Amino acid sequence: VDNVLWHHKSLFVQIKDTRNDFPLSGVIGVQHWAQWGGTSTNPKIGKQPQSIKDLIRVICGSEGGGDATVSDQINVLGNHYGSYDFKLAFTQPNWQVSAYYQHFFEDKSGMIFVNNTDGLWGGQLDLPKFPWLRKVVVEYLVTRDQSGQFHFIDFDHDLHPGVGGGGDDYYNNGEYTTGASYFNRA
């Protein structure tokens, strides 16, 4: 897609005892990036919507209007990347241990946690005064759920009731096929 527009926002809140009387602290936040607008090199897709109304749709993670592709009308307008970040830490004078979870999303289903526990789970031990080991980090990446079984949008909803989902196919997008790349590099 040529002449792509980008949107980014992030907000983090840290809860911490500034007098160091209480050892627990926490961080909660959100990061959100979106590619939108531009003109696809695929003639079947063509020019993507990019009005002020479409910008508001992108900022809010809403589905596209009537001038968007069918997939963007069903899901969200544009190509979205983001995460909800959670961290809990326990601090002592000579060490700190923390656990964190980054719940990533690429579309509406991930934004509303339909992709369940997909994300990055981690733990960290900080030893600032230890002579030869300062930090130990353990992380576990889960991508198995991808919002459930694959879409059944084309099926008869009377015969197959429920909400379609699945097939998130992380970091791939039907309209923005090169993703977040510059000169075909990530």
Q: PLM ranges: what are they?
A:
Residues 1-160:
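Signature for the C-terminal beta-barrel architecture of outer-membrane proteins
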Residues 147-186:
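C-terminal structural cap/anchor segments
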